[in-house]
Amino acid sequence: MKNDDLYVIQSDNTGMIKIGRSINPEKRLKQLQTGNPNKLKLIASFEGLGWKEKMLHEQLSFYRLEGEWFSYECVGELPLNIYEKIEWGALDDWWNNN
């Protein structure tokens, strides 16, 4: 049985960050996008690390907005191994062209 992946999704309009877990982060993105007026992008996923979700939610609790959504300012508090996997330059290009 496959372990859940940890994923990081960002909203284009608000910059909000969602940290969650799913067996299929791409499918989860599509579910979240349905009915959401803001464009969402999967900005990072980590195979088999879904078990770290709760720890990250606790670590970032100061930045929590609602449920699993956090203000953009939380990125400075992300563990280095997660922060470094996000391709920030490519992300800027994506938001600017969509």
Question: Which role fits each region the language model picked out?
Answer:
Residues M1-N98:
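Non-catalytic accessory segments flanking enzymatic or RNA/DNA-binding domains
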